[in-house]
Curated annotation (Swiss-Prot):
Record gene name: aroD
Functional description taken from the UniProt entry: Involved in the third step of the chorismate pathway, which leads to the biosynthesis of aromatic amino acids. Catalyzes the cis-dehydration of 3-dehydroquinate (DHQ) and introduces the first double bond of the aromatic ring to yield 3-dehydroshikimate.
UniProt lineage: Bacteria, Bacillati, Bacillota, Bacilli, Lactobacillales
Quaternary organization: Homodimer.
UniProt-listed Enzyme Commission number(s): 4.2.1.10
Protein's recorded name: 3-dehydroquinate dehydratase
Matches recorded under InterPro entries: Aldolase_TIM, DHquinase_I, Type-I_3-dehydroquinase
Pathway the protein acts in: Metabolic intermediate biosynthesis; chorismate biosynthesis; chorismate from D-erythrose 4-phosphate and phosphoenolpyruvate: step 3/7
CDD domains: DHQase_I
Family that this chain belongs to: Belongs to the type-I 3-dehydroquinase family.
């Protein structure tokens, strides 16, 4: 599994304070731009991409529709993403497919999409249908993060991931059952076929997220 570490600066000073040496163990850096005001994203972007030079970067605006911090209408959302993507060519671009379906066609020019679905309330009964639709679009990555309320939720996420990966071997999946119960899904990629996991430096970006150092230790034990 590749470890993705989110960074969530709220201003330029916090960008400049990021210790790049602490990111050394990360395989990919996710810039969570929703911690900034919309009009500050392009101002801060040059410093972010300079800091992350040499690392793969996922550009993410997690909106309030899926548990994030920025409230953007459909066109605002796609416009900011396209501006950053065009100017700075991040390795991956997160797109909240179900929340912004009406503007998805405007993103088809980008082959590096992470089509994501987030549900902080539950593991929905139509999980398989959601995963099937996202997979059918053949993005760079299918990402699904749902809240685990029961042990069965955790097992379901792992089983569904294993099934979809076995049928779509070339597709990259990143599946997470959030919360304390779901921690196992964050390190079980060797079994399930989930290819990415998310870990924190300091502040977590989702419930149940483990530290970068602990995640690396667990993966080394399980994968070697």
């Amino acid at each position: 599994m590749k470890i993705v570490v989110p960074i969530m600066p709220r201003n330029l000073e916090e960008v400049e304070a990021i210790d790049v040496e602490r990111l050394a163990e990360a395989d990919i850096v996710e810039w969570r731009a929703d911690y900034l005001l919309k009009d500050d994203i392009l101002r801060v972007a040059p410093a972010i991409f300079e800091k992350c030079s040499g690392k793969e970067v996922v550009f993410t605006i997690r909106t309030t529709r899926e548990g994030g911090h920025l409230d953007l209408d459909d066109q605002e959302y796609v416009n900011v993403i396209k501006e950053v993507a065009t100017l700075y060519q991040p390795d991956y671009i997160d797109f909240e497919y179900y929340s912004y379906k009406s503007v998805f066609e405007q993103m088809l020019e980008f082959p590096n999409l992470v089509l994501s679905y987030h549900n902080f309330e539950e593991t929905p009964s139509n999980y398989m249908e959601i995963m099937s639709e996202l997979t059918s679009l053949s993005p760079a990555v299918v990402k699904m993060a749902v809240m685990a309320k029961t042990e069965q939720d955790v097992l379901d996420v792992m089983n569904y991931t294993r099934g979809f990966k076995s049928l779509n071997t070339e597709q990259i999946f990143a599946t997470i059952a959030m919360g304390e119960l779901g921690k196992l899904t964050r390190i079980a990629g060797v079994i399930t076929g989930s290819c990415w996991t998310f870990a924190s430096l300091d502040e977590t970006s989702a419930p149940g997220q483990m530290s970068l150092s602990n995640t690396r230790k667990f993966l080394e034990i399980l994968e070697n």
